[in-house]
Regions:
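ABC-family P-loop ATPase nucleotide-binding domain
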Residues: 1-8
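A structural signal for multi-pass alpha-helical bundles of membrane permease subunits
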Residues: 9-13, 17-306
Length: 306
């Protein structure tokens, strides 16, 4: 006798339930990607298309004039305002590239020097015994609880007294002491046996040799994690660069982007240029994270921080 009714595959039912559980994740991904998609498409639209209501999801005609040359966009008006992104600053030696150069110089310098100083300090705190070590470590941890905004005015006065306004020194030097990096790397180094360092000392290795040959290779995952934190944080830093610069040629990308927005406030024609500048500003940090995300996750996991 044949059974009546249809047979339901339990695996198919489980698969559907799994897809439903993932639906909020898919929606969240769309919400996260939407601003970037809007930024890219708006930077490729003409002035006329930017004024269309409702706005178009795809550019009807791809316009590159927002990035480089306004001659690609015959609808642009007010030539001195609507000049392409990389031609808006004829008084600067490298145009908009000048802001990119400033950002890269400042970011690379701060990131490299901060990691060197932080790793050296973490090595001393975690693998050396000296009087006052615990007190110094408590000071490092305590300084993490002080809001960084507290040091803005004293920091500016000090930089001004040193004559560093509108120089790279004002960007780099105040950003070097980072307590969180010392704390993070110290936590990571506690997982490395002290016997390894002691054995190297018995074999006659100098402290620099131990640091360079043993500590740095073992710190690689944690250093990459801190590199991402530092690089992204300094790349997006706005308030301090705004305070210490009075000349346009020393501005970084976030400051230049804010100035660009203020100069075109209320002008729909500058929206495409602003979106293009925003895209250029965000590309390096996105690329850095995607290139190092595996090391980043590993460094966070092995540090013992939750």
């Amino acid at each position: 006798m044949e059974r009546s009714g249809s047979f339901t595959n339990p695996f198919e039912k489980k698969s559907r339930a799994s897809k439903l559980r993932r639906l909020p994740i898919y929606l969240l991904v769309v919400v996260m990607i939407a601003p970037y998609y809007w930024m890219i498409t708006s930077s490729l639209k003409s002035v006329k298309e930017l004024q269309v209501v409702p706005p178009t999801l795809f550019p009807r005609d791809v316009i590159l004039g927002n990035y480089y040359d306004s001659k690609y966009n015959p609808e642009m008006f007010q030539q001195e305002v609507m000049q392409g992104l990389f031609q808006r600053y004829p008084d600067l030696k490298f145009g908009f590239f000048r802001f990119m150069i400033n950002s890269f110089v400042v970011n690379i310098s701060i990131t490299v020097l901060t990691l060197i100083i932080g790793s050296l300090a973490a090595y001393v705190v975690s693998k050396h015994r000296f009087k006052g070590k615990r007190f110094i470590y408590l000071v490092i941890i305590g300084s993490m609880m002080i809001p960084w905004q507290v040091g803005l005015i004293p920091g500016f006065l000090l930089v001004d007294d040193l004559g560093w306004i509108n120089t790279y020194w004002a960007y780099i030097v105040p950003a070097l002491p980072k307590a969180f990096i010392v704390f993070f790397l110290t936590q990571y180094l506690t997982s490395i046996p002290d016997e390894l360092v002691e054995a190297a000392r018995i074999d006659g290795a100098s402290e620099f040799t131990i640091y360079y040959r043993i500590i740095l290779p073992l710190l690689k995952p944690a250093l990459i994690a801190m590199m991402i934190f530092t690089a992204i944080g300094e790349w997006n830093n706005f308030l301090w660069p705004l305070i210490i610069t009075t000349s346009q040629d020393m501005a970084t990308l976030p400051v230049a982007l804010a100035n660009l927005r203020n100069s075109g406030a209320g002008n729909i024609g500058t929206q495409g240029i602003i979106m293009g500048a925003s895209l250029i500003t965000s590309i390096p940090t996105i690329a850095l994270y995607f290139a190092t995300q595996k090391h980043f996750i590993r460094g966070i996991a092995l540090s013992g921080l939750k």
